[in-house]
């Protein structure tokens, strides 16, 4: 069992599942403040955690399945290249997790089921081909990160989905920016591996400008939840800290050409953006 949890990257699954829970709680706070008839189901909330954990684990397992040749060189101790789990077992286990997660999602409501099904398809395509495609790989990671919060809100149906659209967009934009910056950081190693990332395709400078554009867009859009009276003044205060980190991250990638530092700053910006939604709801 320990080996299969390692294949799933259980720690990563838990963090994603926690993000789903945050989505549930934020959507509940927003909706319950507008209507006294909104209730929070502990059972459905538990299912959200389990579904995100399982589907994320399925995606991670499938990623290892397709990366077997690369991992033989770069990560020989991983479950598949080390021989702890056979290639076929890893594939069947990942498919089992996908099916279980999607089935549980439809038990919550049809909207959750549709999102889980669509995200599973994106994860499969990402592991198979999208991650090797310039920009579309970055966009896939951005969407999947943002949709984790959206999935949590979907427990309340379309109203919950609409309540978290801005959080979804901010998380997606910021993640895409950081993913491109990470590709700029890894450009030397990626060239040696024959990868086709955005910086390799158009150059580090142009890719940095694209990353900065996504970061700026996320920053400029950050006041929207307050202006629309979705979140309170506390949100505005904390998100301002996130915006400062976004600005410094952009400066580091454009002015200092320091992709590693910029990537870390984008990560801090995303953390404070998440905190701002929690305190502002």
Curated annotation (Swiss-Prot):
It is an enzyme of class 2 (transferase). It is found in: Cell membrane. Keywords: Cell membrane, Lipid biosynthesis, Lipid metabolism, Magnesium, Membrane, Phospholipid biosynthesis, Phospholipid metabolism, Transferase, Transmembrane, Transmembrane helix. It is a multi-pass membrane protein. Pathway: Membrane lipid metabolism; glycerophospholipid metabolism. Its cofactor is Mg(2+). The chain crosses the membrane at residues 14-34, 38-58, 95-115, 149-169, 207-227, 235-255, 259-279. One of its GO terms (cellular component) is plasma membrane. GO terms for biological process: glycerophospholipid biosynthetic process. Gene3D superfamilies: UbiA prenyltransferase. Its main location: membrane. CDD domains: PT_UbiA_DGGGPS. One of its GO terms (molecular function) is magnesium ion binding. InterPro entries: DGGGP_synth, Prenyltransferase_related, UbiA_prenyltransferase, UbiA_sf. PANTHER family: CHLOROPHYLL SYNTHASE, CHLOROPHYLL SYNTHASE, CHLOROPLASTIC. Prenyltransferase that catalyzes the transfer of the geranylgeranyl moiety of geranylgeranyl diphosphate (GGPP) to the C2 hydroxyl of (S)-3-O-geranylgeranylglyceryl phosphate (GGGP). This reaction is the second ether-bond-formation step in the biosynthesis of archaeal membrane lipids. Belongs to the UbiA prenyltransferase family. DGGGP synthase subfamily. This is Digeranylgeranylglyceryl phosphate synthase. It comes from Methanococcoides burtonii (strain DSM 6242 / NBRC 107633 / OCM 468 / ACE-M). The lineage of its organism: Archaea, Methanobacteriati, Methanobacteriota, Stenosarchaea group, Methanomicrobia.
